[in-house]
Amino acid sequence: MDEKEFAKICKALGDENRVKILKMLTAGELCACRILEEFSITQSTLSHHMKILSDCNLVSVRKDGKWSYYSINCKTFSEFKNVISEISCEKNTKSECSCK
């Protein structure tokens, strides 16, 4: 995962509704209508949120006729988690500045 993809995911996660949607999807695949039941938003607003989550590959969408079913993309989350681990403070050690 490159920095651009990572930043795009961080931006997507910056909205509490999208975080709530992702938490709902941890239970498994859900129809858009089921997700919508949990929010006080319009269908078009939900579609906007789902497009953002889908565009950065956090969720996968499966179409069945007029219905859309969403699920978490575990591969993307695994890669995102790896990048978070790479920039963790746990590995931070003091080093001498070379410009002295």
Describe each model-derived feature in a short phrase.
Residues L46, L53, Y70:
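Divalent metal-coordination and catalytic microenvironments
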Residues D2-E5, C74-K100:
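Amphipathic alpha-helical dimerization/coiled-coil segments
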Residues K4-K11, D15-T42, S68-T76:
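N-terminal helix-turn-helix DNA-binding core of bacterial DNA-binding proteins
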Residues K11, K20-K23, S54, S60, ...:
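A cross-family signal for key residues in well-ordered alpha-helices
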Residues E37, S54-D55:
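Alpha-helical residues within the helix-turn-helix
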Residues K23, S47-H49, K66:
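Base-recognition residues in the alpha-helical recognition helix of bacterial helix-turn-helix
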Residues D55-D64, S71:
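Beta-hairpin "wing" of winged helix-turn-helix
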